[in-house]
Design a protein with these regions (language model features):
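Alpha-helical transmembrane segments of multipass membrane proteins
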Residues: 7-18, 43, 89-93, 115, ...
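Helix-terminus/linker motif at the lipid-water interface of multi-pass membrane proteins
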Residues: 15-24, 82-111, 115, 133, ...
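Functionally critical, cavity-lining and gating residues within the transmembrane helices
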Residues: 9, 26, 84-88, 99, ...
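Alpha-helical transmembrane segments of multi-pass membrane transporters/permeases
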Residues: 1-11, 25, 29-32, 123, ...
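Transmembrane helical elements of multi-pass membrane transporters/channels
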Residues: 5, 34-38, 42, 46, ...
Length: 278
């Protein structure tokens, strides 16, 4: 459903912005419609295929312990999402300062970028569920095996996506940008090739998010998000005035890898990851 929402969003962006010339309002409207369709689609799917997830009368009672767990986890998730969106807004503001060409290149490239690593993000969410289920069942061995398998699968997929984005960046940009817009395409290619070379970083980060949420430590996911976004914003604003928009592109993966290092270091020290092979 996320993939459908992304495709619908792209199509509606082109229709509202290019055909109807609604500008920013058109982009916002396209996003709302796409997200609404995705949400309703998921609801209908659950009602039709997952009957056991539907609440019954016996479930309709207040449980303070469950409420507290939901409150604590959701609050941390809200903080994480707020930090992410705030960082994205700051980066967007910096990009806008470079003019219309850079804004257009960034808008097109980010859509491609987001679509490219979307499966890795969803894989991280599924990994979180796997970890949580086995943590609740005290299946430490399965968690260890699952972590190793997840790393292998994510690494292989990220390398494949990196190859496609890096070597076909121009063709991907031409999906959204007219061939005559040479400067926009050039900047978009630069963005995609820099990000594309570093998808291992974002793949690892999504696994770390999923792992720490699954073992009941969502606060660590928030810390990693703050490190990733904080590094991105700080480096972008520090070096963009002298190095240009290229500094913004490089700040993004540097933030990923710094957060990865922090998450892995914590896992080794506190989660005993080095004991997994013993």
């Amino acid at each position: 459903f996320l993939a459908i929402a992304t495709i619908v969003n792209i199509v509606l962006d082109v229709f509202f912005i290019v055909s109807l010339r609604l500008g920013v309002s058109g982009a916002a409207l396209a996003t709302i419609i796409a997200q609404a369709l995705s949400g309703f689609g998921i609801m209908i799917y659950v009602f039709l295929t997952q009957k056991d997830l539907l609440p019954t009368r016996q479930h309709c009672h207040y449980d303070i312990e469950v409420f507290q767990k939901i409150r604590d986890y959701s609050l941390l998730t809200c903080i994480q999402q707020s930090v992410m969106n705030f960082g994205i807004l700051m980066i967007q503001g910096l990009v806008n300062s470079f003019g219309v060409l850079t804004m257009s290149a960034f808008a097109a490239a980010v859509k491609i970028d987001s679509f490219a690593y979307m499966p890795v993000q969803d894989f991280g969410n599924a990994f979180s569920t796997f970890i949580a289920q086995n943590k609740g069942a005290n299946e430490e061995e399965r968690i260890q095996k699952g972590l190793k398998s997840a790393i292998c699968i994510s690494t292989i997929f990220c390398l494949m996506i990196s190859f496609g984005v890096v070597f076909f960046a121009k063709e991907l940009m031409l999906i959204f940008i007219h061939p005559s817009e040479i400067e926009i395409i050039a900047q978009g290619i630069q963005y995609l090739q820099i990000e594309g070379m570093c998808y291992l970083g974002i793949g690892c980060l999504f696994l770390l998010y999923g792992y720490y949420r699954g073992v009941g430590k969502p606060g660590i996911s928030v810390v990693l998000t703050v490190i990733s976004l904080g590094t991105r914003v700080a480096l972008a604003y520090l070096f963009a005035p002298t190095l240009g928009q290229c500094a913004i592109w490089w700040a993004i993966p540097i933030g990923w890898f710094l957060a990865d290092f922090t998450g892995i270091f914590y896992g080794i020290k506190k989660e005993n990851w080095l004991q997994f092979n013993k």
